[in-house]
Amino acid sequence: PITYYMYPIISNECLGMIFALPGKGKTLFALELAWRCSQGLDFMDWKFNNMIKPPPVLYVEGEMSATQVQDRVSSMVERDRGLKDFDLDNFYIAVLKEQPNESYQKLKTPEGRLNVQNSADEIYKKTGKKPIIFLDNVRFLMGNFNEKEGQDWIDFVLWLATLRAKGYSTYFLHHAVNTGEKASGSGYQDSNLDVNIKLSQPDENSATDHSSDHFTQIQFEFKKMRENVIGQMTPFIMVVDRNKGSWSKFPVLNKTERKIKSMLDSGKSAKDIINPEKEGMSKANVHKTINKLKGENDGVDKKTSNREAKEVC
């Protein structure tokens, strides 16, 4: 049976892709998700399933050094200190740059794929739990391959399907095409996914008022999910405080809708806000915004909220 670690973003036997343009938050988000899952911590509105023990994580990194990854993990440890006892042995890192001459076998080769699978099997033998595998990112870890050719993806995609059949969950990170609308490649890499996540930078009209000097904004969108849950398919904005390392969630609103939300948050009623003389404050627009905000809070699947071993946010 499928068991969710964090409903609905990650479960056992899950194959997921996170794609974005370079520098738009793939590693920042994936490391945070991996860390919190390995320690049984909630992540924004995604609640960790406290009916099960946290799974180990194997994070395979193709760009950063082990020191850079460990520095990021250390900052998360410091931030979360006091929330619960940590199990740092539940978070494993394999880094391309730490191999002699960066000679880590590429995932395009059978040897490279076997290396990762053997590492995952060793963690399973040691802990008794199958790790979640993160591959960051495909372009660097695969090596010399033509991502626009479906033929070049076949062995990799079949290997991911084999891992899933063995009970392993795998998330791989990938770059987007220049428009940012879809993952780069032939489309074959999307064919077997349970979860497909698009990350992007919010456009100027929908970005929040947080200063770009101190905060990073990432727009999150599920492009595909194993289960279509009401409210979960709605895009939202994640705001990361770079000093504190904290993550906050905001609805995607234009500037007028954000102004209406601010007035509602201050205690004003719809009747107080409606003003046909003011641009954007018509009765129709105010109620449209209220309904949009209400939809942000309706992401609970009533049918699945009582299922065993599933926490629904």
Located regions from the model:
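The Walker A/P-loop phosphate-binding site
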Residues: 1-78, 83
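Amphipathic alpha-helical transducer elements in NTP-driven molecular machines
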Residues: 3, 66, 70, 110-117, ...
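Conserved RecA-like P-loop NTPase ATPase core
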Residues: 10, 59, 136, 193, ...
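Phosphate-binding/switch region of NTP-binding enzymes
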Residues: 17-18, 23, 28, 151-243
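Conserved, well-folded catalytic cores of nucleic-acid-processing
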Residues: 36-40, 76, 141-144, 163, ...
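Conserved catalytic network of the ASCE P-loop NTPase/AAA+ motor domain
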Residues: 49-53, 123-127, 162-166, 190-191
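Conserved inter-motif catalytic segment of the P-loop NTP-binding fold
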Residues: 51-146
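C-terminal regions of RecA-like/P-loop NTPase motor modules
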Residues: 126-129, 165, 205-313
